[in-house]
């Protein structure tokens, strides 16, 4: 999950906020997962593993289906009312508001270049006459646009920004784009869910370097003790192979953050 406007967000208003204090049940860890996220099955397992590492009973709360309005308001409300921690957030500097903090990463994913062409092995093989795309606002697409701007006009591909990873993949499948740069976990999930994407494949980003991003969990900034313990638990699960086992068990395109 990524909300571009997070850095500008004021603490959201929640009606009767005074009713909600810190949960006093010291035997449970309530963790939220977003059913819209591509890593949902992985997040569920990692949340349970974190709870176990803390010797707590894990209580999963699935959110997102009936959300309306700004996600940032919903995140604040569920952290205030329901969950101690919310899994599935990219570790991007200077994005999150002061009232929110993020754990260390538990997996590292990559942005991938996807095409329907069976012959191309990398971006360098894509003819300059072809149109390439990327999901607008992502760090990988920003780097791609910066790279294209550094080239002479005659050496550039035409670049078309798209609203979402799913739209980008559909445009590749429909032949509107020769290739598209998307979040690897999104491609993993969407290819399983949509038969139109079965023929799509990943090619190398060369001449661009790999574009990776760590993913962790958010919680209220005031929960400093919990944050420290979550980081220790994640580090232990990364070190003992638990997270790697979860990722491999799902064939998920990511690696543990060491």
Feature annotation, model-predicted:
Residues 23-28, 107-114, 192-235, 250-258:
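Periplasmic-binding protein-like
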Residues 10-89, 93-95, 249:
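Extracytoplasmic small-molecule ligand-binding "clamshell" domains
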Residues 41-54, 119-121, 127-139, 211-254:
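Extended ligand-binding regions for polar small-molecule ligands
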Residues 77-80, 85-98, 143-146, 173-211:
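A ligand-binding cleft/hinge motif common to bilobed small-molecule-binding domains
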């Amino acid at each position: 999950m990524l909300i571009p406007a997070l850095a500008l967000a004021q603490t959201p208003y929640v009606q009767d906020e005074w009713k909600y204090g810190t949960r006093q049940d010291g035997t449970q860890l309530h963790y939220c997962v977003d059913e819209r996220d591509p890593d949902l099955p992985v997040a569920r397992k990692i949340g349970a593993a974190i709870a176990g590492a803390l010797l707590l009973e894990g209580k999963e709360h699935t959110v997102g289906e009936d959300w309306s309005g700004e996600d940032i308001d919903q995140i604040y409300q569920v952290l205030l009312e329901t969950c101690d921690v919310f899994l599935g957030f990219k570790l991007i500097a200077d994005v999150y508001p002061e009232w929110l903090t993020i754990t260390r990463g538990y997996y590292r994913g990559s942005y991938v270049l996807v095409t329907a062409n069976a012959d191309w092995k990398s971006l360098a093989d894509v003819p300059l006459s072809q149109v390439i795309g990327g999901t607008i606002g992502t760090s990988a697409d920003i780097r791609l646009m910066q790279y294209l701007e550094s080239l002479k006009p005659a050496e550039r591909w035409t670049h078309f920004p798209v609203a979402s990873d799913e739209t980008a993949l559909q445009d590749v499948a429909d032949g509107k784009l020769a290739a598209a740069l998307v979040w690897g976990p999104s491609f993993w999930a969407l290819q399983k869910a949509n038969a139109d994407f079965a023929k799509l494949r990943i090619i190398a980003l060369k001449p661009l370097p790999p574009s990776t991003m760590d993913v962790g969990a958010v919680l209220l900034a005031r929960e400093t003790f919990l944050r420290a313990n979550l980081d220790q638990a994640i580090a232990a699960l990364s070190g003992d192979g638990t997270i790697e086992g979860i990722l491999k068990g799902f064939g998920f395109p990511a690696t543990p953050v060491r």
